[in-house]
Each structure stands twice: as structure tokens, then as C-alpha cells.
Amino acid sequence: MLPNLRRIFASFRTEEEERSYSRKAFFHLIGYITCSVLFSWLVRKKVISSPVVSSPIHALS
């Protein structure tokens, strides 16, 4: 079987470097999740607060 790539790269780094990479990846993940939730909330808020138009013809009149 193929060896685990993360383990191969980790073997070339010190414990402190590995911890630093792990923390950085964790905070990037938290940032991504936070932005996703924020954008979803903003879009949902805008969709709920905007009037719903049933068809483009009604929008013109």
C-alpha cells in the first residue's frame, strides 16, 4: 500500500513546525466555515426581506 502522504511530509519537519502547520490549517478551516455561515446568513436575510415577484411581467407593471 501507499504510505500516508501526511506522515511522509511530517517526518521532514520538527515537532514545532508540525504544530504550526496544524494550527494554521485549523484556523483556515474555522475562517472558511465562518465566512460560509456569514454569507449564507446574509443571502438568506436579503432573500427573506426582499419582495417576491411571481413573474417578470408583474415586475414591469
Curated annotation (Swiss-Prot):
Interacts with the ER-mitochondria encounter structure (ERMES) complex. Interacts with mdm12. Interacts with mdm34. This is ERMES regulator 1. Residues 1-20 are mitochondrial intermembrane. GO terms for cellular component: cytoplasmic side of mitochondrial outer membrane; mitochondrial outer membrane. It comes from Schizosaccharomyces pombe (strain 972 / ATCC 24843). Disruption phenotype: Decreases the number of ER-mitochondria encounter structure (ERMES) foci in cells. Abnormal mitochondrial organization within cells, manifesting as fragmented or aggregated mitochondria, spherical mitochondria, or absence of mitochondria. Decreases the level of phosphatidylethanolamine (PE) in cells. Decreases growth on glucose (fermentable) and glycerol (non-fermentable) carbon sources. Simultaneous disruption of ept1, psd2 or psd3 leads to decreased growth on glucose carbon source. Mediates the formation of endoplasmic reticulum (ER)-mitochondria encounter structure (ERMES) foci, thereby contributing to the formation of ER-mitochondrial contact sites. It comes from the Eukaryota. The lineage of its organism: Eukaryota, Fungi, Dikarya, Ascomycota, Taphrinomycotina. Pfam families: Emr1. It is a single-pass type III membrane protein. Residues 44-61 are cytoplasmic. Belongs to the EMR1 family. Keywords: Membrane, Mitochondrion, Mitochondrion outer membrane, Transmembrane, Transmembrane helix.
